[in-house]
Amino acid sequence: MKHKPIFLLAVIVLLSACGQSYEEKVRLSRAERARLAQEEAAALKVAVLPTLDCMPVYLAKQNHWYDSTQVDLRLKVRNAQIDCDTALKGKSVEVAVTDLKRVEHMTKHGVGLLTMGPTDAYWQLIANRTARVKTAAQLGDKMVAMTRYSATDYLTDKALDGVKTSAPVFRVQINDVLIRLDMLKNNEMDAMWLTEPQATTARMFKHTVIEDSRKMKEHLGVVVAGAHLMKDKKRVKQLTAFVEGYNRACDSLNHYGVKHYADLVKAVCHTDDKTIDRLPKYSYPHIALPKQR
């Protein structure tokens, strides 16, 4: 019994120490979260899709082809263009690879954007082989997957302009490019607009190309940034470093070809070797800030 007070005191001291340790951990955890949030806010965040037009961003990031003392480059991967644009509108990213029709839509809604340059993105309207559709005129009473207020919406208008169909064409908003392709594979959609490499996969499965944005003379891919960034010297330095890395990646892709980076394409586009082997030639133009043009 003589040792009982000593034992109780030891337990109290131990519990007190544990309590202090827990409080310290909570404090450090909050400090760490605050530090990470600050770093995230200061970084240059770029919204990208699992598509070939975004390859210069992926490649520049993988190989660190930019001045890391000037920019902490972070990629925000989304499967839907509309999600990239929402992030750009909400300023949770600074740069996005998008299309001119999405840019027009955002601009109309008060989003200030800076166009940095075009991409070589193109879209093909591909009909499910089971739908027996070979021309736009045969799309009556068929479902076409697209995204509202985007290149695919605009291209649908253009494809149907002056065309008589037997019944209305049903536009179905399927924003996720990977889900869109899966719906074609599973015969859940009659037709859809796809860019690369998803378009190549669709062609590989013998689905029918009925329209092509290149034949329509429409070049709609673009890289944009928030216009407000040009008022911030640090952000301008970040953008300058990003542009240098992006253009270096373009040069490498144009020189070696996108198939040279098959492992990266498979990883970021969620595709396979068979699709990559069948990819057509794809070119990558440089981008620039306005003062650099």
Question: Which role fits each region the language model picked out?
Answer:
Residues 130-137, 161, 167-170, 181, ...:
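Proline/Glycine/Serine-rich low-complexity intrinsically disordered segments
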Residues 232-293:
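Secondary-structure end/capping motifs
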Residues 62, 89, 108, 161, ...:
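Sec-exported extracytoplasmic/periplasmic mature domains
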Residues 118-127, 204-235, 239-246, 281-286:
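Periplasmic-binding protein-like
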Residues 16-17:
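C-terminal motif of bacterial Sec signal peptides marking the signal peptidase cleavage site
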Residues 1-7:
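Bacterial N-terminal signal peptides that target proteins for export
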Residues 22-172, 183, 190-196, 210-213, ...:
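Short, glycine-/small- and polar/acidic-enriched structural segments
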